[in-house]
């Protein structure tokens, strides 16, 4: 962690999102009929670098933040939201997921596989995959704006907490508290 610099994150996210988009495009454009393996398992396995970078970034941003890291977070919030929207609003990809979901009872899936299929289908539906194109576009805009506002709010809370504190100058003010505190 000590070698990671805030400036590393934006290009790392850019590369990871490009790779993830390529994986998603290959799944969506697969000419074979959708199967659990070529659609759901492939979708679940996609974006590993993106997920790893996201976890590291979000943990650092929440616990060991800095002005540079917060600037990267503000820049990336709408872009990562747009990335998620692009996947969840991909009509060809959703058609594959939806086709499998429609015949899930006949697929002979293990309980974990069925749960993954149902969860992914629900994620697409909640993101607006069934909406008309204009409504999907608007839902995406709202999601990107919410990502920006959520980031701003979280950063404001962190800044507020960093400036808050109680100075105890009289030991009697600690009366009644356990010694471990």
Each language-model region and where it sits:
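Zn2+-dependent metallopeptidase catalytic domains
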Residues: 1-181
